[in-house]
Swiss-Prot record:
Name the record gives this protein: Inactive serine/threonine-protein kinase BKN1
Species in which this protein is naturally found: Arabidopsis thaliana
Origin superkingdom: Eukaryota
Principal subcellular localisation of the protein: membrane
Family annotation (SUPFAM superfamilies): Protein kinase-like (PK-like)
Gene that produces this protein: BKN1
Length: 331
């Protein structure tokens, strides 16, 4: 296969979500090829220099390089559109055919709350390049768990939660929807206006789940996923509830949580629907710059999302409705 960057025009999916308060853009994309040689990507990213690395997660074995290209011609351009180029190796674990399957999956998804997939570039027996839009504010993880002076205001946190919920509601609305097994804070990207965009690559395989457990990344593991290996839309809802919880608490310091007690168990045993309890749990960096009523309502929503009984968890559209209501609470 020769050097090429391929991108796609858009058409509406067969099933669209219910109307949202923040209007989404729905479309699935049919592929029309346009070439960009690999040397163009190298030029755009300064030959994949280390100082161009913008995102690197050891859990998902991928690395992104920042570059700039002309939005129309896809040629390297200093004044062009920011891109994030991911270099994927074709080896015994993932072949060229595997990555092409990923490309086909990405080509069917387009939404304002999904990171825009611009195309791919590959050669036989060479690395496989996936090209995405560049997220100028980085990942949500870097803001919530970063430096104290970078703490996000309450209104921005709610806005990010709504955007993330919109992306998930869109995915859940599609027939035979792919479930977002990579839904984590570090895969929620933010643009310059703090609009949330889900980075979706492919459903997480069981081997990745096992590897995550070995590395201690069990914070988001739902009861049915961990014990029975059951994965469905309610699993996504549970994971989203965990993200809401970390948005609310804002700290990875688990010293106050007993080692044998999970984050959800700590939450459910500590949370009561009153303002005083919320003040003990909420991110202290917020000070008093938040609505205690809104935070309490978010706590109630978290409880619903993380219910052990999957039948008691709300649909993502219901979660979105709840968040839109929370956004309107000012007292």
């Amino acid at each position: 296969m020769g050097n090429c960057l391929k991108h796609f025009k858009q058409q509406l999916p067969s099933i669209a979500p219910k109307p949202l308060i923040i209007p989404p853009i729905f479309s699935a994309r049919k592929r029309e090829s346009e070439s960009l040689q690999i040397r163009g990507l190298k030029k755009a990213t300064k030959k994949f220099r280390q100082d161009r690395v913008v995102e690197c997660e050891d859990y998902s074995v991928r690395k992104f390089y920042k570059g700039y290209i002309d939005e129309t011609t896809f040629a390297p351009s200093r004044a062009g559109t920011g891109i994030a180029v991911s270099v994927m190796e074709c080896d015994s674990s993932r072949s060229l055919q595997d990555w092409m399957a990923v490309v086909r999956s990405l080509g069917q998804l387009s939404h304002q709350n999904l990171v825009n997939f611009l195309g791919y570039c590959c050669e036989d027996n060479k690395p496989f390049f996936l090209v995405f839009e560049y997220s100028h504010k980085g990942s949500l993880d870097s803001h919530i768990f970063g430096k104290e002076e970078e703490a996000l205001p309450w209104e921005i946190r709610v806005k990010i939660a709504i955007g993330t919920a919109q992306g998930l509601a869109f995915l859940h609305s599609i027939k035979n929807s792919p479930l977002n097994r990579e839904l984590r804070m570090h895969n929620i990207m933010l643009d310059e206006q703090y609009n949330a965009k889900l980075f979706y690559l492919e459903p997480t395989k069981r081997s990745l789940v096992d590897e995550g457990l070995k590395r201690g990344r069990f914070t988001y593991l739902s009861p049915e996923w961990g014990s029975l290996g059951i994965l469905d839309m309610t699993t996504d809802v549970y994971i989203f509830g965990m993200i809401l919880l970390e948005l609310l608490m804002g700290s990875k310091d688990r010293k106050k949580i007993k080692e044998e007690q999970g984050l959800v168990d700590y939450w459910t045993s500590s949370f009561l629907p009153d303002n005083y309890k919320i003040e003990e749990i909420i991110d202290p960096r917020l000070g008093s710059d938040y609505s205690a009523n809104a935070a309490t309502q978010m706590g109630t929503l978290i409880n619903r999302c993380t219910a052990h009984n999957t039948k008691k968890r709300p649909l993502m559209q219901q979660v979105l409705d709840g968040l839109n209501h929370i956004a309107e609470i000012k007292d």
